[in-house]
Amino acid sequence: MGQKSNPIGLRLQINRTWDSRWYAEGNAYAKLLAEDIEIRKYILETAAQAAISKVVIERPAKLCRISIYAARPGVIIGKKGADIEKLRQKLSTMTESEVKLNIVEIRKPEIDAKLVAQGIADQLIRRVAFRRAMKRAMQSAMRLGAEGIKIVCGGRLGGAEIARVEQYREGRVPLHTLRANIDYAEAEALTAYGIIGIKVWVFKGEILGHDPTAQDRLMMEAQTSGVRPAR
């Protein structure tokens, strides 16, 4: 089943946790869920150049705490913090509550699955050969500390008449091992020939012991230390 399941969903409460962390009763759940979707959509559209990997939303009491994981945090913050203040005010209006923003820098975007997938999609839109884009991404990931990476592209690759799927893998990607720290993401490239789908799996080592917050903790430690997270 490891081959067919979403690697993140399979590892929830083992070494991963949810990106939306709050509890709601009754009809409030649907309202807050729709609000989360709108918040993420607005942030990704507003700071499209910031290379955002994920947005974590927490709602303790009447507060909304939003953590944005980005490779280029300066794009979000802006000159003297002007842009981040505008963003905070807009999100506060959307949520009708006080908003606290936390920007987390991703020091190694080459081993972040979401940024790798989006980078390949951007290259395909610019008509870069799909094999070159995939192999370049794999080489960069392995060079910067990934223990394994798998990339799958599907669609009218290279403008072919018949759609097909091609995949490349380097190193180990143990999908059945639940303690494996596997980052997974999908992206779409809107090319002149149609949509090309990209899936990326990045294996970053094993996390021993039960720790649902391990993934976020390792990313925070990498930000403060500036070195590769310990396995």
Curated annotation (Swiss-Prot):
Which key words tag this protein in UniProt? Answer: Ribonucleoprotein, Ribosomal protein, RNA-binding, rRNA-binding
PROSITE patterns the record matches = KH_TYPE_2 (PS50823), RIBOSOMAL_S3 (PS00548)
Q: Name one GO biological process term.
A: translation
GO CC aspect terms: cytosolic small ribosomal subunit
Query: The KH type-2 domain covers which part of the protein?
Result: 39-107
Which superkingdom is the protein from?
Bacteria
For this UniProt entry, the molecular function terms from Gene Ontology, in alphabetical order, are: mRNA binding; rRNA binding; structural constituent of ribosome
NCBIfam families this protein is in?
rpsC_bact
What family does the Swiss-Prot or TrEMBL record give for this protein? Answer: Belongs to the universal ribosomal protein uS3 family.
Q: How does it assemble?
A: Part of the 30S ribosomal subunit. Forms a tight complex with proteins S10 and S14.
What functional role does this protein have? Binds the lower part of the 30S subunit head. Binds mRNA in the 70S ribosome, positioning it for translation.
Q: Which HAMAP family match?
A: Ribosomal_uS3_B (MF_01309_B)
What name goes with this protein? Small ribosomal subunit protein uS3
Question: Which organism does this sequence originate in?
Answer: Erythrobacter litoralis (strain HTCC2594)
Q: Source taxonomy lineage?
A: Bacteria, Pseudomonadati, Pseudomonadota, Alphaproteobacteria, Sphingomonadales
